């Protein structure tokens, strides 16, 4: 896996501009902040942590882990809440995902299918062979 950083560009903080990888691909559907009983965590940070833990659980089924993620798209219902809590978001991310920073996008949305969901995260992983 190789992080792509064009010459002269500043190093991004908390994500990669691009990643090149060869191997077996794993696609993780949109994970939200509820547990296996369908109960939502309370608040954005708690839902983020649960959505990340759910992502890791799905990856584990494929023999993968957070270190294999090459792309994430986060859909958030409140961009202001996201922007105002970046330090806590970063800490929650590192607690679950470690220091793997894939190509990422954060997209503001007016709502998600599950009305109590505050965030939904899609991921793509590559297990190098």
What are these regions (language model features)?
Residues 1-70, 76-129:
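N-terminal presequence-like segments and the immediate start of the first folded domain
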């Amino acid at each position: 896996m190789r992080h792509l950083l064009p010459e002269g560009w500043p190093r991004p903080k908390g994500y990669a501009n691009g990643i090149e990888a060869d191997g077996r691909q794993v696609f993780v559907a949109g994970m939200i902040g509820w547990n296996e009983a369908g109960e939502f965590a309370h608040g954005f940070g708690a839902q983020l942590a649960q959505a990340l833990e759910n992502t890791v659980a799905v990856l584990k089924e494929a023999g993968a882990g957070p270190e294999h993620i090459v792309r994430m798209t986060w859909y958030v219902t409140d961009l202001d809440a996201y922007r105002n809590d970046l330090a806590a978001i970063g800490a929650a991310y590192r607690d679950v995902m470690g220091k793997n920073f894939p190509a990422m996008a954060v997209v503001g949305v007016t709502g998600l299918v599950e009305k109590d969901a505050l965030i939904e995260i899609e991921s793509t992983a590559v297990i190098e062979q």
